[in-house]
Design a protein with these regions (language model features):
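Active-site Gly/Thr loop motif
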Residues: 14-64
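Bacterial peptidoglycan biogenesis and beta-lactam-recognition machinery
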Residues: 1-5
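Structured C-terminal helix/loop/strand segments within mature extracytoplasmic catalytic/sensor domains
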Residues: 48-118
Length: 118
């Protein structure tokens, strides 16, 4: 397979910037080196985008997660023509995600990592 993004760039994304030691951030990515998402591996890093989209990378698990958004009725029946599925809160081990997008993204990353490892 062909590597599109240079390896050095990918490696740097996972390392916090030395220019701002108080915030786990590098090349537009939030870095988990200080445990921002405690249940995810420390080598994880992610970037949230508009509309609730996000990209999460966990090199130690050989894992890349692309989270699709869904705010502002983006996937509503009136916009897609498809019936909406009802939500369920009775699944064992599942919790309602936080309203804050940053916290919800961290929880999503932790749950995906747990399912890969577990």
């Amino acid at each position: 397979s062909e590597q599109i993004v240079p390896e050095s760039y990918v490696r740097q994304c996972a390392n916090p910037s030395p220019y701002n030691p108080h915030f786990p951030y590098s090349l537009q990515f939030t870095v988990n080196a200080m445990g921002e998402a405690p249940a995810a591996p420390r080598d994880a890093y992610w970037k949230a985008g508009s509309g609730g989209h996000a990209l999460c990378v966990v090199p130690s698990l050989d894992l890349v997660v692309w989270k699709l958004g869904g705010r502002d009725e983006q996937y509503s029946e009136k916009n897609t023509g498809l019936p909406e599925h009802s939500t369920r809160d009775d699944r064992e081990g599942w919790e309602k995600l936080a309203e804050d997008d940053g916290e919800a993204l961290k929880k999503t990353l932790e749950m995906v990592c747990a399912s890969v490892v577990g």
